[in-house]
């Protein structure tokens, strides 16, 4: 699958602001500053399409990225930023929940984690929701270029243990800088789009 054209189709805070459901969507969730926007940029081959920041909490809206006018990648607000007020955290959580619970054209939800760190309680809760909702449970372990090669297997095993992942095919170590494993991820996205949602009807 080759993405020729892509753009930021919609920025939404409320459900009324979402684009129509004519295209399949694949959503990406994860804690703040985990590298979701950089991952989406690398997948779409667009350096600055998804806004990135070294400061956590940059993505506060649901951002819809149109690819080839055939499907959308959806960047959900990051969760778990410690310096955010309780009311703000609740607001972000509601934005995420509203999207995930109401989108009929949602084909799959990926959890994005930082390969350098053990998944948080919120990561586990999010992953459990993904599985319980009938999705496959794919995980992207980003920032691969930030650790030594000898640590990769060890860190992946920690992530798999914490999230109770038994199938190695569900987790991809990934570098948005070198685009390591981009081909494998693109093939997986193509399979999802071809065969539809992981949800059992």
Swiss-Prot record:
Swiss-Prot/TrEMBL keywords: Cell cycle, Cell division, GTP-binding, Magnesium, Metal-binding, Nucleotide-binding, Septation
Disulfide bonds: none
Domain EngB-type G: 22-195
Domain of life of the organism encoding this protein: Bacteria
PROSITE patterns assigned: G_ENGB
Residue intervals passing through the bilayer: none
Oxidoreductase listed as a keyword: no
Residues engaged in binding GTP: 30-37, 57-61, 75-78, 142-145, 174-176
Residues annotated as binding Mg(2+): 37, 59
GO terms for biological process, alphabetical: division septum assembly
A Pfam family the protein falls into: MMR_HSR1
Cofactor: Mg(2+)
Sequence similarity: Belongs to the TRAFAC class TrmE-Era-EngA-EngB-Septin-like GTPase superfamily. EngB GTPase family.
Protein name: Probable GTP-binding protein EngB
Species whose genome carries this gene: Finegoldia magna (strain ATCC 29328 / DSM 20472 / WAL 2508)
Lineage, uppermost ranks: Bacteria, Bacillati, Bacillota, Tissierellia, Tissierellales
């Amino acid at each position: 699958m080759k993405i020729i054209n892509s753009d930021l189709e919609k920025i939404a805070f409320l459900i009324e602001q979402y684009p129509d459901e004519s295209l399949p969507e694949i959503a990406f969730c994860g804690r703040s500053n985990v590298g979701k926007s950089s991952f989406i940029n690398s997948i779409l081959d667009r350096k600055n399409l998804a806004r990135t920041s070294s400061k956590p909490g940059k993505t506060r809206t649901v951002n819809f990225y149109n690819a080839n006018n055939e499907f959308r990648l959806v960047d959900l607000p990051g969760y778990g930023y410690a310096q955010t007020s309780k009311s703000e955290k609740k607001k972000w959580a509601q934005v995420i929940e509203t999207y995930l619970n109401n989108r009929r054209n949602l084909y799959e939800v990926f959890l994005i984690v930082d390969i350098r760190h053990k998944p948080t309680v919120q990561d586990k809760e999010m992953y459990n929701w993904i599985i319980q909702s009938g999705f496959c449970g794919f995980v992207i372990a980003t920032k691969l270029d930030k650790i030594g090669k000898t640590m990769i297997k060890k860190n992946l095993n920690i992530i798999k243990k914490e999230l109770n992942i038994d199938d190695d095919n569900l987790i991809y170590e990934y570098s948005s800088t070198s685009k390591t494993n981009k081909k494998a991820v693109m093939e997986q996205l193509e399979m999802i789009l071809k065969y539809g949602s992981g949800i059992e009807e």
